[in-house]
Amino acid sequence: SPALKKLGVKNRSRLFEIPPHIEYLTVKPHMKRYMQVSAEIYGVLLKYVAPEDVHVYSIDEYFIDSTPYLPLYKKTPRELAQMLLDAVLEATKIYATVGIGTNLFLAKVALDILAKHAPDFIGYLDESLFKETIWHHRPLTDIWQIGNGIANRLHKYGAYDLHGITMVPEAKLYKEFGVNAELIIDHAWGREPCTIA
């Protein structure tokens, strides 16, 4: 949790790694219930968008291509997001967050880094905002698809944020990461070639 992170406890720590002076509760997961609620939320979304425009990314995350729905509902992306958040809250009593982006990567980063700290639970990124707000964000491991292993390998080249990655010669990145360098480079520039379709 963010509170534990502030106390220096790393994400995905094992219980014995938590310092003894920190009080905490362990709560057993209720996967059956989580799956039921996830299905409820998915059902709410399908009242507003077609299944072919939704990609279920995980039990608690969805990508939605909202392009055809903006003119249909006569809403901006933020207004549509708020409409969906309100519908989910009304149906499930669960507060959700939304990341809006001009591509899947920017939407995911807007969710992970901006929305969870926004008062309205909505984060937005386009290519120019990405360079202003995310390009120099640290640590790299906050960025979607960059784990500790990849981050440590990037650190060898002096890259500690996405902007730093853009400064590394591409040939070095391809030598280090092979074909996976292409995605790392695209993401460093805020690009994402994949779509929901």
Describe each PLM feature range:
Residues 1-186, 194-196:
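Gly/Gly-Pro- and Ser/Thr-rich, intrinsically disordered tail segments characteristic of DNA damage-repair
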